[in-house]
Amino acid sequence: MSVAPIDFQQVEKRYDDKLVVDGLSFHVQPGECFGLLGPNGAGKTTTLKMLLGITHPDAGSISLCGEPVPSRARHARQRVGVVPQFDNLDPDFTVRENLLVFARYFGLTAHAARALVPPLLEFAKLESKADAKVGELSGGMKRRLTLARALVNDPDVLVLDEPTTGLDPQARHLMWERLRSLLARGKTILLTTHFMEEAERLCHRLCVIEEGRKIAEGAPRMLIEAEIGCDVIEIYGPDPVQLRDELAPFAERTEISGETLFCYVDNPEPIHARLKGRTGLRYLHRPANLEDVFLRLTGREMLD
């Protein structure tokens, strides 16, 4: 059996008196895209810092690429590429120079580093921007350059922290296509994201954490079927509490978030009949998705 590229076992981390990671366990299989989801403050960033050996756990065990962390984190990181949440590209360098300089951090010779640049530029679709300064790039181009830079050491594992935050839909879809191509090449990916569509499209499995604890784990479709299992009618109106009292008898379950009432239904027709022709209301009937799972598990929207 091959060694899991990432393995967390009963990991804990405290800051002062607050337990920010509480007995967290998960593992990532070779060639898998594994998502780590949770609201702000759930412990995702601390988890990534412990994985990379930047922060030391107070209890539990961590291994990365078969190496114990933090004791051999430096060795493990030689086989890891990291895309941070915020771009840390060098603005004084060109696109090409950013790749060349970063390659030298991994001990590559100047000749080997120069040989890497053309295929990385092609991968990032930045061939025409090789000699442009970072400040001349769009947000999507910067994210693709950061991803290309993370590949200079041909890593086995990629750790991506919010890889498409701040990108427009077109740039986000291009980033997803690049990530899928890496999975097709056998790379292992751990990613945090606030975008449920992103998690559903990319992740083979995911783990939802809240207050440092794992509250669900599994394939996206499995979680949707287990936690929701039916269609959803979203109703937008001025008095969701009154609407809930009226429509609850015709739904399997109802939830309110802001001014929106969510009705989870096996048969939508009774609710459709009662909403038809009403003024001041908007509603949408759709299949259940990961956003519904998140709301169900945490009681909060993802972006809080």
From Swiss-Prot:
All residue ranges annotated as the ABC transporter domain in the record: 6-236
GO molecular function: ATP binding; ATP hydrolysis activity; transmembrane transporter activity
Location (main, coarse): membrane
Keyword Nucleotide-binding annotated: yes
GO CC term (a single one): plasma membrane
Location(s) in or outside the cell: Cell inner membrane
Highest taxon in the source lineage: Bacteria
Entry's EC annotation: 7.6.2.-
SMART domains: AAA (SM00382)
Enzyme class: translocase
Keyword Plastid listed: no
Key words, A-Z: ATP-binding, Cell inner membrane, Cell membrane, Membrane, Nodulation, Nucleotide-binding, Translocase, Transport
Gene3D superfamilies hit by this protein: P-loop containing nucleotide triphosphate hydrolases
Complex formation: The complex is composed of two ATP-binding proteins (NodI) and two transmembrane proteins (NodJ).
Role description: Part of the ABC transporter complex NodIJ involved in the export of the nodulation factors (Nod factors), the bacterial signal molecules that induce symbiosis and subsequent nodulation induction. Nod factors are LCO (lipo-chitin oligosaccharide), a modified beta-1,4-linked N-acetylglucosamine oligosaccharide. This subunit is responsible for energy coupling to the transport system.
NCBIfam families (alphabetical): nodI, PRK13537.1
Protein family according to the UniProt entry: Belongs to the ABC transporter superfamily. Lipooligosaccharide exporter (TC 3.A.1.102) family.
The protein, known as: Nod factor export ATP-binding protein I
